[in-house]
């Protein structure tokens, strides 16, 4: 007889007919994302896994390690390369057009210096989404990253490409920048996908309200 049960985030068996999907929503925030990294490590250390993840900006870049189940990786490589100009620096911005060096962050680190576990990522069935801002429409677009291969990494980079400090990323017919501009906390997006319960990891106080960036009019000069 088929066992029609699933397990919730506590590992308890629940009837699939009444199963309520639990999502994990990760806000961005550049290096404030180290807080997110710590939360994700604690969740993994306690074997708490949700049914899906959506990340924005740093939440996307760091959240992929939750799907690949690499405890400590985010904090480890950030500590190792924090002082390396190729990782994040004004020199990188002037030399490459990106304050976070695209080749170093999305090629050298995951493929050579602190290897990302692609096989574990692909074998893990939970869906992982990122959010990015469409430069042409001003709307948020969402992408499910199936393999974390080259094309998926372009979407991840786009999600974390801060305006004024990064080049727009062109992928799949879009020209994209940081998803935090259009949907910094994509809770509503996940609720529409059927995730009725969600763990939301914030990197700002709950009463924080985003104000217009006075430098945004100068973006057209880049």
Which residues does each predicted region cover?
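Patatin-like phospholipase
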Residues: 1-56, 64-222
């Amino acid at each position: 007889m088929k066992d029609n049960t699933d397990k919730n985030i506590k590992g308890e068996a629940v009837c699939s007919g009444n199963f309520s999907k639990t999502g994990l929503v990760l806000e961005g925030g550049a290096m404030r994302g180290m807080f997110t990294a710590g939360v994700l490590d604690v969740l993994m250390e306690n074997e708490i896994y949700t049914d899906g993840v959506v990340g924005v900006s740093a939440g996307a870049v760091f959240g992929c390690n939750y799907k690949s189940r690499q405890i400590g990786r985010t904090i480890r490589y950030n500590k190792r390369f924090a002082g390396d100009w190729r990782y994040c620096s004004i020199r990188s911005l002037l030399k490459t057009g990106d304050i976070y060096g695209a080749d170093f962050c999305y090629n050298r680190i995951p493929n050579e210096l602190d290897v990302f576990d692609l096989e574990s990522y692909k074998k893990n069935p939970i869906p992982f989404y990122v959010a990015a801002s469409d430069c042409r429409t001003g709307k948020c677009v969402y992408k499910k990253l199936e393999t974390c291969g080259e094309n998926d990494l372009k979407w991840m980079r786009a999600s974390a490409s801060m305006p004024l400090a990064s080049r727009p990323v062109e992928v799949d017919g879009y020209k994209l920048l940081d998803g935090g501009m259009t949907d910094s906390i994509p809770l509503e997006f996940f609720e529409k996908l059927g995730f009725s319960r969600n763990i939301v990891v914030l990197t700002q106080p709950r009463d924080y309200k985003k104000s217009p960036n006075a430098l945004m009019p100068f973006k057209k000069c880049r």
